[in-house]
Amino acid sequence: MDEYKSKLPRIPISKCKKIARTDPEYILTSQAAFAATAFTTELFIQMLAEETCSLAQIHKQTKTLRLNYEDLSTAIRNLDKFQFLSDVVPQTENLASLVRENKVRYTIVNPSPEIDIESEDEVDEANEPEVGEPEVDEAEVEAEVEAEAAEPETHTLDEPRPESSS
């Protein structure tokens, strides 16, 4: 029995079939092809993990090693054979630096006391609408929400009535 189990891939063949069927160019494929795909996927994951582990051991000073997303994205960025994965596993960036570079807009609605805001000018600049962006009148939004709440709910016979929480 153990000898038979060692001949099977660790990745379920049914998962390979499911993933293959999501491809719009899917054609009928034999069971052997799915098994080969499962084995090659297993070998690829093993190789990626080993390469990531060896790079992480070089860069980290601790004896115990736990791989994380940062290690994986660094290995993909540094090793040529994994460059094709750079879009799927991008390098993480600090949110504060992205806000400073105006790559991301970040608005604090209710700042909590734990958040350290560098200066009020930066927050005011971040909250100003960009050129061409329509300004939102809060009174109009509140009026629309109240109007929607005042409308009676209608249901067809096919739809179940939502459970009331009262």
Swiss-Prot record:
Q: Where is the composition biased (Acidic residues)?
A: 115-151
Function field? As accessory component of the DNA polymerase epsilon (DNA polymerase II) participates in chromosomal DNA replication.
Sorted UniProt keywords: DNA replication, Nucleus
Spell out the subunit comment. Heterotetramer. Consists of four subunits: POL2, DPB2, DPB3 and DPB4.
Q: What else is known?
A: In eukaryotes there are five DNA polymerases: alpha, beta, gamma, delta, and epsilon which are responsible for different reactions of DNA synthesis.
Give the subcellular location: Nucleus
From its record, what is one biological process in GO terms? DNA-templated DNA replication
Cystine pairings recorded for this chain: none
Per the record, its GO cellular-component terms are: CHRAC
Q: Tell me, in one coarse class, where this protein mainly resides.
A: nucleus
State what protein this is by name: DNA polymerase epsilon subunit C
Q: Which organism is it from?
A: Kluyveromyces lactis (strain ATCC 8585 / CBS 2359 / DSM 70799 / NBRC 1267 / NRRL Y-1140 / WM37) (Yeast)
Highest taxon listed in the record's lineage:
Eukaryota
Q: Where is the composition biased (Basic and acidic residues)?
A: 152-166
Positions of region (Disordered): 112-166
Record bears the keyword Protease? no
One GO term in the molecular function aspect is:
protein heterodimerization activity
